[in-house]
């Protein structure tokens, strides 16, 4: 079950309250994403314009989890 994730790259468009972000994916779709625990634990800052990797569930393609921020 845990392997049913879709990984896709995107660009952070906007920062929202409660550590949520609007991310524009490579295919042009805009989704709502939150930060994964490891990024939060290591105090990695995510700003608008950053390129990120997002994990999405195949059941809800409007939400995701940011798992990596590119340098």
UniProtKB/Swiss-Prot annotation:
GO molecular function: ribosome binding; rRNA binding; translation initiation factor activity
Keyword Membrane tagged: no
A Pfam family the protein falls into: eIF-1a
RNA-binding in keyword set: yes
Gene3D superfamilies assigned to the protein according to its UniProt record, in alphabetical order: Nucleic acid-binding proteins
CDD domains for the chain: S1_IF1
Localization terms from the record: Cytoplasm
Start and end residues of each S1-like domain: 1-71
UniProt main location, coarse: cytoplasm
Signal peptide interval: none
A cellular component annotation (GO) from this entry: cytosol
InterPro entries assigned: NA-bd_OB-fold (IPR012340), RNA-binding_domain_S1_IF1 (IPR006196), S1_domain (IPR003029), TIF_IF1 (IPR004368)
Alphabetic keyword roster: Cytoplasm, Initiation factor, Protein biosynthesis, RNA-binding, rRNA-binding
Family named by the database record: Belongs to the IF-1 family.
Quaternary assembly: Component of the 30S ribosomal translation pre-initiation complex which assembles on the 30S ribosome in the order IF-2 and IF-3, IF-1 and N-formylmethionyl-tRNA(fMet); mRNA recruitment can occur at any time during PIC assembly.
Protein role: One of the essential components for the initiation of protein synthesis. Stabilizes the binding of IF-2 and IF-3 on the 30S subunit to which N-formylmethionyl-tRNA(fMet) subsequently binds. Helps modulate mRNA selection, yielding the 30S pre-initiation complex (PIC). Upon addition of the 50S ribosomal subunit IF-1, IF-2 and IF-3 are released leaving the mature 70S translation initiation complex.
Protein name: Translation initiation factor IF-1
Organism: Leuconostoc mesenteroides subsp. mesenteroides (strain ATCC 8293 / DSM 20343 / BCRC 11652 / CCM 1803 / JCM 6124 / NCDO 523 / NBRC 100496 / NCIMB 8023 / NCTC 12954 / NRRL B-1118 / 37Y)
């Amino acid at each position: 079950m845990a392997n049913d994730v879709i990984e896709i790259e995107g660009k952070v468009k906007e920062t929202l309250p409660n550590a949520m972000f609007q991310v524009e994916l490579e295919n042009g779709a805009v989704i709502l994403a939150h930060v994964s625990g490891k990024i939060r634990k290591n105090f990695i800052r995510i700003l608008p314009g950053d390129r990120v990797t997002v994990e999405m569930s195949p059941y809800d393609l409007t939400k995701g989890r940011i798992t990596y921020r590119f340098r």
